[in-house]
Amino acid sequence: SELTIAAQGPNTDTIAAILNRPVPEGAVKFDGHLRAVENAFHIDRMNAQLGQSNLSGDLKLIQGKPPKLKGQISSTYLDYALFQDKNKTGQTTGEPTKVKPVEDSAEADKKVTPKEQRRQLLPDTPITLEVFDQIDLDMAIRFDEVVNFMGFDPVHDLKAKIVLKGRALLVSNLEASGIRGGDLKGNFTLARDAELTRIDVDMKGRHLRFGLAAVPGQTLDSYPPVDIEAKLSGAGNTYRTLARALKGRIKAVQGEGRVSNNTMGLLLSDVFYELFQAINPLAKTEPTTRLQCGVYIVNLDRGRAEIQAVVIQTDKLTILSAGTIDLNTERINVGFETRPRKGVGISASMLTNPYTKLGGSL
């Protein structure tokens, strides 16, 4: 059987009542050609509009356990708020979580009980992907502009192939621009193989501006831009065993921009903020740090992260770092060296301790 549908309305009041939550205002329109063939339901030449948002494409829903949804959809403009329930918003106090500083790893071991010593940061809970059992997907998407998406700026030219089948999620040929002012592309796989959950990440970002320690009123274009490459893989039956099996490489190159020293204090725990002030002593007296460039290279092999090279250059200092973070033992051993740059009015004698080491348990 076949059916052609064309419907429209002046506003979204009826849809808001059905969903029992606010939706963006505007006209409503839908048209498409519906076909029912055996156990499959087709929507061909679909065009839907809700307010300024629109979707078009072809869909095929195949009945079964689980049901299967195939097709391709595109949009010239999509407001992601349509898919968010504003009546279910969580509230936070806005206060940062502070961690009690530890002076020395050996001294810390003396202060904790044997039970506390057995506690580990990475949970040893099984990874379950039952949510993937709800539906099989085989979709190609192309969105020209998406707004209100997870706190990002308007995302442009979002493209991806998404396949979900048998507890395996594959996102391939992902491309997007406007992600924190930059571009993102790559592939991602999360799959269950027998008793193990496998993850494969191959992503590249260009000119991403995260602004995690922004100065109040700071504009996006003055955040330090970051080019990042991440290639990781691993498999495990718990979050802990998966982390300890990770292999790969992360490389980031950072450009010029400003960060707020006071905001860093809110983002970091006490011990890491003290470390930040130790390797950047000017943060104690100056409100901002002007970063000029930075290079960060981390290699992972079976859960052991080797910080191969970290070089950070501000307008007044050069900071070097190297070390290891072992997810098997959950211990960290990282050293830092701070050098004053020539011709900026800072001498080595002005640095209380140019060498800083962070070691101990995570």
Model-derived features: positions:
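Small-residue helix/turn framework positions
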Residues: 1-54, 64-92, 131-152, 157-362
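Intrinsically disordered, low-complexity segments enriched in small/polar residues
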Residues: 86-130
